[in-house]
UniProtKB/Swiss-Prot annotation:
GO-annotated biological processes: division septum assembly
Residues annotated for GTP binding in this entry: 29-36, 56-60, 75-78, 142-145, 171-173
Ranges for region Disordered: 194-218
Chain residues that bind Mg(2+): S36, T58
GO cellular component terms attached to this protein's record: cytosol
The keyword S-adenosyl-L-methionine is annotated on this UniProt entry: no
Role, per record: Necessary for normal cell division and for the maintenance of normal septation.
Family per record: Belongs to the TRAFAC class TrmE-Era-EngA-EngB-Septin-like GTPase superfamily. EngB GTPase family.
Gene3D superfamilies registered for this protein in UniProt: P-loop containing nucleotide triphosphate hydrolases (3.40.50.300)
Keywords, comma-separated and alphabetical: Cell cycle, Cell division, GTP-binding, Magnesium, Metal-binding, Nucleotide-binding, Septation
UniProt protein name: Probable GTP-binding protein EngB
Organism: Oleidesulfovibrio alaskensis (strain ATCC BAA-1058 / DSM 17464 / G20) (Desulfovibrio alaskensis)
Amino acid sequence: MQPKLVLENTIYTLEQLVSFNAPQIALAGRSNVGKSSLVNTLAGRKGLARTSSTPGKTRSINFYKVDPDGYYVVDLPGYGYARCSKAEREKWAKLIRRYLVETPAVCAIAILLDCRLSPQKLDVELAAFARQAGLPLLPVLTKADKCKQQERALRQREWRTILGGEVPLLFSSKTGMGKDKLWQELHRLAFPDMAFDTPSDGAPEPADEPEAASERAE
């Protein structure tokens, strides 16, 4: 049975933050990387998270409760949108940092990376921040359907090198690629002490052959 997402709270300042004891996994990424589309894909319906072709539209922290598991997926404002004023960019960057550092329930960061782009400076900096903060990192390459197999494999190799061996998950909101695997990884991060079933061969998917698992029916 697929979990359900329920929008439980939206805040614009940390003073509005409601204390949740349940684990929280932050969704972070550049503006227009596809966070809202990813949330809607996980939910299995359009409209739960508002999407826009204009970068930088999400200017709040949205808390989605995962039922029946009880943990939260927290959608953070996108970063790096050049058309925002410097003061506004700094305001939201500060809010994101404070949330990640000052919220004990945050147990991991899912960093969304545009599969079409080589590693970007702000993404690399966020990955380094997560390591310094001791937060597990789940890298997700979004918009993978827009890239050919060779480009997907290249992007996975680039990020594997940067992340010290961690291979990003391929994901597409359009085709559903990686949806089931992402749910599995989110649950694993929320409840790290629980035992999980592993693939029959027990081996991770090779980085240079990413299509093997992703092209199977979700």
